[in-house]
Amino acid sequence: MGKTVVCPGSFDPLTIGHLDIITRSSKLFDKVIVVVMRNYSKNVGSFTTEERVDFIKRCTKDLPNVYVDTHAGLLAEYVKEKGAHAVVKGLRAVSDFDDEFRQALTNQQLNPDMETIFMVSNSEHMFLSS
């Protein structure tokens, strides 16, 4: 059985930094699911969910083990539903770690089998934010 990971985010818009994390994940894991998370409590962004999915699919078309999906519920439930082993999150700076750490702890309580893997952003992409 291969290792499946989830790369979650709003991806509004998808940045070169996001694409770098997705590409690097695709080299480390058998299957990478990029999931565009829909957060109805946030204001509508620059692009619709469908536009973001289409853009990610076009940008990852040469990565055969990358799949794109959407989800409007809890990430921990999605990971369990997909049979994934972990979530991969990119960190640009130490300031990102605090929020991501708290989210990881919450997800771990909701799904004890779920791991969170932090990947440090490539230095040339550290200042990009969606």
What are these regions (language model features)?
Residues 1-130:
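Nucleotidyltransferase catalytic core that binds NTPs
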